[in-house]
Amino acid sequence: MTILASISSIGNVKSISKSNNVSLSNSSSSLQSMNSIQCGGCGNGGLLGAVGGLVGGVLTGTGVIVGSVLHGVGSILTGGSNNCGCN
Protein backbone atom coordinates (compact mmCIF):
# COMPACT_ATOMS: atom_id res chain seq x y z
CA MET A 1 0.00 0.00 0.00
CA THR A 2 2.93 2.34 0.49
CA ILE A 3 3.85 1.96 -3.19
CA LEU A 4 0.39 3.13 -4.24
CA ALA A 5 0.59 6.07 -1.84
CA SER A 6 3.95 7.13 -3.25
CA ILE A 7 2.65 6.90 -6.82
CA SER A 8 -0.34 9.08 -5.98
CA SER A 9 1.93 11.64 -4.31
CA ILE A 10 4.11 11.74 -7.43
CA GLY A 11 1.00 12.49 -9.48
CA ASN A 12 0.19 15.40 -7.18
CA VAL A 13 3.68 16.83 -7.55
CA LYS A 14 3.37 16.76 -11.33
CA SER A 15 0.09 18.67 -11.24
CA ILE A 16 1.62 21.31 -8.95
CA SER A 17 4.57 21.82 -11.30
CA LYS A 18 2.17 22.33 -14.21
CA SER A 19 0.35 25.11 -12.37
CA ASN A 20 3.68 26.80 -11.65
CA ASN A 21 4.57 26.74 -15.34
CA VAL A 22 1.36 28.59 -16.15
CA SER A 23 2.27 31.41 -13.77
CA LEU A 24 5.71 31.73 -15.36
CA SER A 25 4.22 32.38 -18.80
CA ASN A 26 4.29 36.13 -18.09
CA SER A 27 8.10 36.26 -18.06
CA SER A 28 8.29 38.92 -20.78
CA SER A 29 5.93 41.22 -18.91
CA SER A 30 7.92 40.64 -15.71
CA LEU A 31 11.10 41.75 -17.48
CA GLN A 32 9.37 44.89 -18.71
CA SER A 33 8.01 45.71 -15.26
CA MET A 34 11.40 45.08 -13.65
CA ASN A 35 13.01 47.44 -16.16
CA SER A 36 10.49 50.16 -15.34
CA ILE A 37 11.00 49.56 -11.62
CA GLN A 38 14.76 49.91 -12.05
CA CYS A 39 14.28 53.19 -13.89
CA GLY A 40 11.93 54.56 -11.25
CA GLY A 41 14.08 53.35 -8.37
CA CYS A 42 17.08 55.51 -9.24
CA GLY A 43 17.70 58.13 -6.58
CA ASN A 44 15.23 56.59 -4.15
CA GLY A 45 16.16 54.72 -1.01
CA GLY A 46 16.30 50.95 -0.99
CA LEU A 47 13.03 50.70 0.93
CA LEU A 48 11.21 52.89 -1.59
CA GLY A 49 12.51 50.73 -4.42
CA ALA A 50 11.20 47.62 -2.68
CA VAL A 51 7.74 49.12 -2.23
CA GLY A 52 7.68 50.15 -5.89
CA GLY A 53 8.66 46.63 -6.88
CA LEU A 54 5.87 45.06 -4.87
CA VAL A 55 3.23 47.48 -6.18
CA GLY A 56 4.39 46.96 -9.76
CA GLY A 57 4.16 43.19 -9.33
CA VAL A 58 0.61 43.33 -8.00
CA LEU A 59 -0.56 45.64 -10.78
CA THR A 60 0.93 43.69 -13.69
CA GLY A 61 -0.19 40.19 -12.64
CA THR A 62 0.43 37.35 -10.25
CA GLY A 63 3.25 35.85 -12.31
CA VAL A 64 5.27 39.04 -11.90
CA ILE A 65 5.14 39.16 -8.11
CA VAL A 66 8.02 36.72 -7.69
CA GLY A 67 10.39 38.74 -9.87
CA SER A 68 9.32 42.01 -8.29
CA VAL A 69 9.85 40.71 -4.77
CA LEU A 70 13.31 39.44 -5.69
CA HIS A 71 14.17 42.82 -7.20
CA GLY A 72 12.76 44.55 -4.11
CA VAL A 73 15.00 42.53 -1.84
CA GLY A 74 17.97 43.47 -4.00
CA SER A 75 16.99 47.13 -3.73
CA ILE A 76 16.90 46.91 0.05
CA LEU A 77 20.37 45.38 0.17
CA THR A 78 22.00 47.68 -2.36
CA GLY A 79 19.98 50.82 -1.70
CA GLY A 80 18.92 50.94 -5.36
CA SER A 81 22.11 52.80 -6.26
CA ASN A 82 23.15 50.48 -9.11
CA ASN A 83 19.83 51.01 -10.89
CA CYS A 84 20.68 54.58 -11.98
CA GLY A 85 21.05 55.49 -15.63
CA CYS A 86 18.06 53.84 -17.28
CA ASN A 87 18.22 53.09 -21.01
UniProtKB/Swiss-Prot annotation:
Disulfide pattern: none
Family per similarity comment: Belongs to the hssA/B family.
Stated name of the protein: HssA/B-like protein 18
Database matches in Pfam families: Coiled (PF05710)
InterPro entries: HssA/B-related
Residue ranges the record marks as coiled coil: none
Organism listed in the record: Dictyostelium discoideum (Social amoeba)
